[in-house]
């Protein structure tokens, strides 16, 4: 998806290895739809992906995955990162958002700010940055301590 963000857990081995780190809801809402590797979080909880803000999580594993109709609050565990659902080169979560049915770019007029981290497109796909409080990290396609961030910190 154009404008999506990818986050990979710290895993010891294997491109599609299981992760013990959970994916959490970025906001309060209702799980409006699930499919193989997919969770849709409807922030206005009306169950309609065409209205209001909706968050897409892609590559969510089937183990302990939130179910359609679940109401969640920000920070609620909703599943585990995986390679399920679509094409994937390794265990990660792909997160994007829609407003009234239209995909909204992460680095656009309304940036996709997560816990103060603001995304910026790179010169090529998958080489963007996140900036918070004057600190910038650059996306990495290999496990790198310098690109490590943790929700809630």
What does each model-found stretch correspond to?
Residues 1-26:
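Short glycine/threonine/proline-enriched tight-turn/helix- or strand-capping micro-motif at secondary-structure
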Residues 5-12, 64, 70, 76:
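Catalytic cores of extracellular degradative/oxidative enzymes
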Residues 13, 17, 67-73, 96-153:
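Acidic, glycine-rich catalytic/binding loops that coordinate metals and/or anionic ligands
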Residues 12, 28-30, 44, 80-84:
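Short beta-turn/strand-loop junction motif enriched in small, turn-promoting residues
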Residues 18-68, 89-97:
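Zn2+-dependent peptidoglycan hydrolase active-site motif and core
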Residues 39, 72-87:
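Short hydrophobic beta/alpha edge segments that flank linear recognition/processing sites
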